[in-house]
């Protein structure tokens, strides 16, 4: 069998990793082994945290909705139940945005939900 020379492929693979490690401090941006470890870890964190971000934002929205709901004499769970009964299909992101930017609009929605609970 003929000998396989991998100079070009190996260099291209190493350069790809070093390019991803650009901007890292010290040896992590210069040495292939350190860069490989740093890039692997960074990509794992990025993958994980893209999912964690969704959880964090949902928790933030719920906290904001709950605070505004309590100002209107409802708990979060009763507000959501009332909205479902009133067939008001607003998601948590929009409700939280309303609670922060348009308290009067949120109060109107909360009153409709409250009316459905009576």
Curated annotation (Swiss-Prot):
GO terms for molecular function: rRNA binding; structural constituent of ribosome. It comes from the Bacteria. InterPro entries: Ribosomal_bL20 (IPR005813), RIBOSOMAL_L20_CS (IPR049946), Ribosomal_protein_bL20_C (IPR035566). The keyword Hydrolase does not apply. Keywords: Ribonucleoprotein, Ribosomal protein, RNA-binding, rRNA-binding. One of its GO terms (cellular component) is ribonucleoprotein complex. One of its GO terms (biological process) is translation. Binds directly to 23S ribosomal RNA and is necessary for the in vitro assembly process of the 50S ribosomal subunit. It is not involved in the protein synthesizing functions of that subunit. Belongs to the bacterial ribosomal protein bL20 family. This is Large ribosomal subunit protein bL20. It comes from Syntrophotalea carbinolica (strain DSM 2380 / NBRC 103641 / GraBd1) (Pelobacter carbinolicus). The gene is rplT.
């Amino acid at each position: 069998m003929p000998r396989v020379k991998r100079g070009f492929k190996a260099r291209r693979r190493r350069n790809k990793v070093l390019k991803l490690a650009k901007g890292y401090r010290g040896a992590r941006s210069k040495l292939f082994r350190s860069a490989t470890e740093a890039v692997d870890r960074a990509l794992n964190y990025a993958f994980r945290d893209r999912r964690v971000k969704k959880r964090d934002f949902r928790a933030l929205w719920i906290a904001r909705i709950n605070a505004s709901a309590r100002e209107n004499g409802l708990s979060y769970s009763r507000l959501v139940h009332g909205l479902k009964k009133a067939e008001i299909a607003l998601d948590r992101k929009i409700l939280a945005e309303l609670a922060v930017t348009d308290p009067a609009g949120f109060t109107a929605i909360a009153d409709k939900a409250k009316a459905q609970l009576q």
